[in-house]
Amino acid sequence: MSGDGSPEIEVDGSGLRVAVVAARWHAETMDGLLAGARRALEASGVTEVTEVRVPGAFELPVAAARLARAGHDAVVALGVVIRGGTPHFDYVCDAATQGLTQVAVTTGVPIGFGVLTVDNEAQALHRAGLRGSREDKGAEAVLAALETVVALRGVAPLPQG
């Protein structure tokens, strides 16, 4: 859901329990991502929201797994990883992406992927939903997760237990 080709999504999320897990690194960008996520949740009618903060993107999967298993209908993961001069960027991006994918597949709970993997801070800020930003990835991650919950409920609801 990036750039000019992103779909227009409106989802009725009333009655859904949603968790947002957000990293702390890159505070200005994270403030924008969280604000966008909150706006999208409110606009979609979601009133039961749990927010959890973790140190960085590497910690997102374990928190997302715990929240998914705690009965949330969807989990939204927000973070920022900015490329540096070492392979650390690749390791963290891969761990976050693979970890969040594993959580979604093993739990059956949709994960909204709002982890920015960028080359520099300017790219992150342009995607953070701040005044003057080109994109609002926090909101997009929420809408993707909610739309997936609604789509799956119609064809393959999770067993209650």
UniProtKB/Swiss-Prot annotation:
<dbReference type="GO" id="GO:0009231">
    <property type="term" value="P:riboflavin biosynthetic process"/>
</dbReference>
<keyword id="KW-0808">Transferase</keyword>
<feature type="binding site">
    <location>
        <begin position="80"/>
        <end position="82"/>
    </location>
    <ligand>
        <name>5-amino-6-(D-ribitylamino)uracil</name>
    </ligand>
</feature>
<feature type="binding site">
    <location>
        <position position="113"/>
    </location>
    <ligand>
        <name>5-amino-6-(D-ribitylamino)uracil</name>
    </ligand>
</feature>
<feature type="binding site">
    <location>
        <position position="25"/>
    </location>
    <ligand>
        <name>5-amino-6-(D-ribitylamino)uracil</name>
    </ligand>
</feature>
<dbReference type="GO" id="GO:0005829">
    <property type="term" value="C:cytosol"/>
</dbReference>
<keyword id="KW-0686">Riboflavin biosynthesis</keyword>
<dbReference type="Pfam" id="PF00885">
    <property type="entry name" value="DMRL_synthase"/>
</dbReference>
<dbReference type="InterPro" id="IPR002180">
    <property type="entry name" value="LS/RS"/>
</dbReference>
<feature type="binding site">
    <location>
        <begin position="57"/>
        <end position="59"/>
    </location>
    <ligand>
        <name>5-amino-6-(D-ribitylamino)uracil</name>
    </ligand>
</feature>
<protein>
    <recommendedName>
        <fullName>6,7-dimethyl-8-ribityllumazine synthase</fullName>
        <ecNumber>2.5.1.78</ecNumber>
    </recommendedName>
</protein>
<comment type="function">
    <text>Catalyzes the formation of 6,7-dimethyl-8-ribityllumazine by condensation of 5-amino-6-(D-ribitylamino)uracil with 3,4-dihydroxy-2-butanone 4-phosphate. This is the penultimate step in the biosynthesis of riboflavin.</text>
</comment>
<feature type="active site" description="Proton donor">
    <location>
        <position position="88"/>
    </location>
</feature>
<comment type="similarity">
    <text>Belongs to the DMRL synthase family.</text>
</comment>
<feature type="binding site">
    <location>
        <position position="127"/>
    </location>
    <ligand>
        <name>(2S)-2-hydroxy-3-oxobutyl phosphate</name>
    </ligand>
</feature>
<comment type="pathway">
    <text>Cofactor biosynthesis; riboflavin biosynthesis; riboflavin from 2-hydroxy-3-oxobutyl phosphate and 5-amino-6-(D-ribitylamino)uracil: step 1/2.</text>
</comment>
<dbReference type="InterPro" id="IPR034964">
    <property type="entry name" value="LS"/>
</dbReference>
<dbReference type="InterPro" id="IPR036467">
    <property type="entry name" value="LS/RS_sf"/>
</dbReference>
<dbReference type="GO" id="GO:0000906">
    <property type="term" value="F:6,7-dimethyl-8-ribityllumazine synthase activity"/>
</dbReference>
<feature type="binding site">
    <location>
        <begin position="85"/>
        <end position="86"/>
    </location>
    <ligand>
        <name>(2S)-2-hydroxy-3-oxobutyl phosphate</name>
    </ligand>
</feature>
<dbReference type="GO" id="GO:0009349">
    <property type="term" value="C:riboflavin synthase complex"/>
</dbReference>
